[in-house]
Amino acid sequence: MELELKPGTTSANLYQTNTAKERYYCNFGLQRKHEHSVESAGVTISGIDTPAEARENKVDSPGSIFEPRNHPYFFGTLFIPQIVSTKEKPHPIVTGFVAVARIKQAALTR
């Protein structure tokens, strides 16, 4: 499924683009009527399904990547990044997590 990534978000920075393709294994999603509540609670909806790619039974559900503001690295996704990640070509979210973990570990061992 094609996703539009919000520029300037951690998601867009990790993918190094404003669009991405992901595979879904669910029909769940955020209902548009709750979008404002999520955003006002400090969570950015940083990846949005493109309308032409709507999943079966998915009703009015735009959000596919969620990230809290003011957190070094946390994601909620409706897809499973590790499923398509391989040793030869790791998923951007997986490599980003490893990079942040290394920085954190280095800070703890100083």
Regions found by a protein language model. Give the residues of each.
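Amide-donor transfer/coupling interface in amidating biosynthetic enzymes
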Residues: 1-110
